Amino acid sequence: MDLGEFRLHSLGLDKEKFGRIYSFVDFGNVNYWYENDRRKWDNNQLKENQKLIIDIEKLANFISEFSEQKRFYYGWNPRVKRSWHITIKAEKCGFIKNTKPMQFIKHYVGEGVISRDGRATRKDANGTYIEIPKSNFDVEISVDAIRLLEKYDSFCLFSGDSDFTYLANYLKKNKKKFIVIASGQVFHTLKELADLYINAQNVKGLIASIKETSPL
């Protein structure tokens, strides 16, 4: 057993048990897994000017160790140039990508209200509002999962979103195994349906990198 096989075995990713695995990455969810982490994968403290980010190349390499196909779903922000670069990077790393521009939904608030997450308020003829970014891929992932149903034995989801519960039930009824890799905030029913649940903290060193932040 080589190092890669040992790593997969320790995570519970047994190829004999799960057969052909297809992985579906909801990157809008994955991208924030370690946003508030202040410790590295070796449990040492990050420096003040450091933060953890998802490393798309490392993510692709990790998935390729156990998955026959890797698919990447991401809503890019037309207002942020780097956002589009994420989709380019994913494609270069061998992901089959499904992308669309992010939508911004107006949410009207009372006069003088301050957004908790620091979003700027705007005004139009109907009043004061904040813009909430929205880019769900539960429909696209579900359609692809069903369309490709006969090609895999196990469906691996990188997300803990409750929107995937119905899909999980469908896959289980069709004799497919269901793997969930997600952060601590996982919808409990989704976790219960999983044949294997892997906490994102257990793969931190395999899919994350340290980024130096600019001084204020």
PLM segments and residue spans:
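Domain-level signal for Mg2+-assisted phosphodiester chemistry and nucleotide/NA-binding surfaces
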Residues: 1-130, 177, 184-186
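Nuclease catalytic cores that cleave nucleic-acid phosphodiester bonds
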Residues: 96-216
